[in-house]
């Protein structure tokens, strides 16, 4: 039901598509790789599918790096592999995952009627940069090339050194980890080293998106959140997501506060050793849309000097309503 609900938010329904839209978690063992890794596949596809055509965005992953990351291979291995495929995938070390994706995909391509795949690459503004149909025999090699290109299009914060990052919304519709690990510079995976860049001392998040349907995966990546966000968390969905990946710390609940003001004042209290005029802060709507942001006075001169950024307005203090909610926002303005 949860899978169908998410598809519905994207307009993918039986009425809109003119075909049945089915969610299924039942899988069967399809075979194994040369290393003995078991390969699972969707039972309904095994029994009824004449052809299989995976469709997915090709982009960098939030938990591992390699020749293939998020894309068609992962859709075949983890998506159509169901809980069995996902569980086995996430039980191995991060360094092994790209190799695993390629090996398991080869087994699937050899045993299932995969016609090919449809790869989607987006630019830094979540606009479609390219859609490419790839025949099965070229699927892996072409995905490797598309991933390298997609990384050159990735958005990034205007600076990689911050005292504080304020995020208006987190959610699965922005990143599989709620807040993109590549943007905030945090992995929080036990036994794995953290990223060297960007370096952000504290991350605060105001809200959880409605489109996330209570799945707050990634909330453990941040330091401060609001009661509003915590009240929206579906613990069952969040825990299932993180127990499947085994990255359980990403589901830990951070310090939370009744209002935006209280949360941000706490973050500033933790930064009290930094002179106010030197505090480096950025406010963004989410970790996907980074075209517009608010920056503190300490950052502004270095951005202006690059000539790559346009200043849209004068410096001003952050504004709050009577309930302590932030009204100075990049997204839709709050009126109450």
Model-identified regions with their sequence ranges:
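Short acidic, glycine/serine/threonine-rich loops at helix termini
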Residues: 2-5, 33-35, 63-68, 129-133, ...
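Conserved, well-structured core segments that form the ligand-binding/active-site neighborhood
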Residues: 41-171, 185, 189
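Short coil/turn connectors at secondary-structure junctions
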Residues: 15-19, 47-51, 111-115, 160-163, ...
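An acidic, phosphate/nucleotide-engaging active-site surface
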Residues: 2-67
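General beta-strand structural signal in soluble alpha/beta enzymes
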Residues: 17-24, 31-32, 54-55, 116-120, ...
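Gly/Ser/Thr-rich loops at beta-strand to alpha-helix junctions
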Residues: 1, 59-61, 171-173, 285-289
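Active-site rim loops that border cofactor/substrate pockets in soluble metabolic enzymes
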Residues: 19-32, 163-167, 171-175, 247-258
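C-terminal non-catalytic interaction/assembly regions of soluble proteins
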Residues: 182-186, 191-336
């Amino acid at each position: 039901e949860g899978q169908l609900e998410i598809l519905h938010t994207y307009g993918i329904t039986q009425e809109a598509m003119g075909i049945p839209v089915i969610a299924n978690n039942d899988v069967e063992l399809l075979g194994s790789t040369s290393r003995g890794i078991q390969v699972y596949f969707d039972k309904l596809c095994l029994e009824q599918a004449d052809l299989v055509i995976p469709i997915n965005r090709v982009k960098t992953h939030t938990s591992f790096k390699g020749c293939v990351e998020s894309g068609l291979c992962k859709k075949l291995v983890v998506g159509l592999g169901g809980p069995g495929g996902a569980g086995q995938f996430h039980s191995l070390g991060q360094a092994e995952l790209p190799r695993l994706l390629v090996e398991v995909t080869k087994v699937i391509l050899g045993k299932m009627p995969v016609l090919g795949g449809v790869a989607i690459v987006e630019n830094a503004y979540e606009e479609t940069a390219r859609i490419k149909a790839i025949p099965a025999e070229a699927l892996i090699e072409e995905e490797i090339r598309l991933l390298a290109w997609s990384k050159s299009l990735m958005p990034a914060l205007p600076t990689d050194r911050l005292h504080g990052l304020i995020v208006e919304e987190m959610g699965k519709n922005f990143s599989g980890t709620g807040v993109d690990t590549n943007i905030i510079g945090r992995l929080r995976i036990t036994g794995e080293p953290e990223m060297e860049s960007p370096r952000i001392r504290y991350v605060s998040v105001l809200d959880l998106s409605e489109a996330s349907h209570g799945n707050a995966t990634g909330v453990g990546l941040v330091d401060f959140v609001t009661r509003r966000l915590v009240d929206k968390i579906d613990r069952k969905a969040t825990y299932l997501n993180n127990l499947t990946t085994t990255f359980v710390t990403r589901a830990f609940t951070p310090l939370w506060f009744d209002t935006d003001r209280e949360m941000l004042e706490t973050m500033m209290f933790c930064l009290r050793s930094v002179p106010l005029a030197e505090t480096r802060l950025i406010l963004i709507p989410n970790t996907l849309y980074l075209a517009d942001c608010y920056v503190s006075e300490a950052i502004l001169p270095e951005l202006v000097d690059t000539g790559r950024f346009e200043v849209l307005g004068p410096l001003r203090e952050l504004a709050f309503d009577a309930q302590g909610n932030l009204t100075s926002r990049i997204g839709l303005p709050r009126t109450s």
